[in-house]
Amino acid sequence: MIYTVTFNPAIDYVVRLDAPLEVGQVNRACGEDCVLGGKGINVSGVLAQLGCPSVALGFVAGETGAWLERGLAAQGLHTDFVHLENGMTRINVKIKAAQETELNGAGPDIPDEALHQLEEKLDSLTENDVLILAGSIPASLPQDVYERLLARLDGRGVRCVVDATRALLVNVLPYHPFLIKPNNHELGEIVGRELHTDEEIAAAA
């Protein structure tokens, strides 16, 4: 089975304007949508479209979390989220006008006991499973949280895929993840130099 983890899921509220955004004024939208997401959830969505089952893990909170969970179920995604007692799953406001403006929510605090619940869900993974860690983390979690999960799974043969930036990505490298997905800039951060040409990128990879 493929398991995806999204530490900070979101409901993206997308508002479209047919005129430039005027700060401090009333702006009338010409259209709006709600998109359920977060990198790991997006991966599960693509897998579902390809006919490949997965389980979306992560954290949800409050009415927005319940709404996100129902929406994903309606899309045919299987979820097994940890439910937080406090806070709310974040809402990101995306204003699409002449220029795009984003207001991204912070997300709920994740206490240690909730993180432990997620770890327990991963304890059953074996060499037949794939774990995909993708995206940013809330400020309440330590920067070594990805490393902590891979260390817990070390030696079990679980194929781990990591799509993250900076310390989140660098800290997992000693555990030899099956696949990492840095872009050019993120790869440059790992090797400690700027990469400009295809040859430089290939050598760094």
Which functions belong to the PLM regions below?
Residues 109-153, 159:
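Hydrophobic alpha-helical segments and helix pairs
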Residues 5-9, 59-62, 84, 136, ...:
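Cofactor-binding loop segments of dinucleotide-utilizing enzymes, especially the Rossmann-like FAD-
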Residues 143-205:
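Conserved phosphate/ATP/ADP-binding segment of small-molecule kinases
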Residues 1-57, 65-67:
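Glycine-rich phosphate/adenosyl-contacting loop at the front of the ribokinase-like
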Residues 5, 81, 132-133, 160-164, ...:
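General beta-strand structural signal in soluble alpha/beta enzymes
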Residues 8-10, 98-100, 106-108, 136-139, ...:
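Short glycine-rich anion-binding loops that position phosphate/pyrophosphate groups of nucleotides
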Residues 23-25, 49-129:
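Conserved N-terminal subdomain of the carbohydrate kinase-like
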